Amino acid sequence: MAVSTRQALLQALSAAGGSYVSGQQLAETLGVSRAAVHKAAAALTAQGYALEAAPRRGYRLAGGDPFCTEAIGDYPAPIYLYDTLESSNRTAKLLALDGAPHGTLVLTAHQSAGRGRLGRRFESPAGKGVYCSVLLRPEMPAANAQTATISAAVAVCRAVKKLCGLELAVKWVNDLYYQGRKVCGILTEAGTDLESGQLEWLVVGIGLNLTSTAADWPDELARKAGSLYPGGPAPVSRAALAGAIARELLALCPAFDCLDEYLSLIHI
């Protein structure tokens, strides 16, 4: 499905993180006329986006972080976006059981009962992180499911580097660090065919702290947790970053052949 000019404009302004972008630059980036940029900007304003236009400065999103599917742009599978969920993984697993297709993306602005490995709680303050789950249906043995977690770590690192210009480090197997603090966790859950030992589905959950601060976490967690942009603002929208991570993960599936890249990211 082609990306509309309106969607492309929203993505470009989201990536600018609230800064002005000139009409000429947007026209060149989007490959359209300045009149088309103006028309798309008017359409976004009519939809309720806090978009500002200023002479000789261009356009900007006042909020800088639209949490909507349009910020994701073109995506090859269904997207489910929520203001709050108990857990994005829980919702994705229910969708898997209901027959949702490969690549289905679930993202939420807040999790009331986010989980990490071994049943640990994952703190998910509203509007301050990327909380998403990707449903995969690879044809592979259940014994190889851990390769999906490894690939998800690579996908997050790739997306963060592309959109934010930041380099993350990996701690085996599913924790990602930035400047010595944990900023991301990955939880992979699976459904298997007991007779064949093959996977029926995988749900890869990703929790990435974007603008959280120590005040958002319990004292014990605050001593070791971190964010990419503590206190904000972030130069990229949560939805756009979630979409980028999901696309990177889908590009690695089903081969999940990225072990060398994963090992090169282990610095902790």
Where are the regions that the model predicts?
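N-terminal lobe of the biotin/lipoate ligase/transferase fold
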Residues: 2-161, 184
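Long, positively charged amphipathic alpha-helical accessory segments at protein N-termini or as interdomain linkers
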Residues: 2-33, 140-168, 178-266
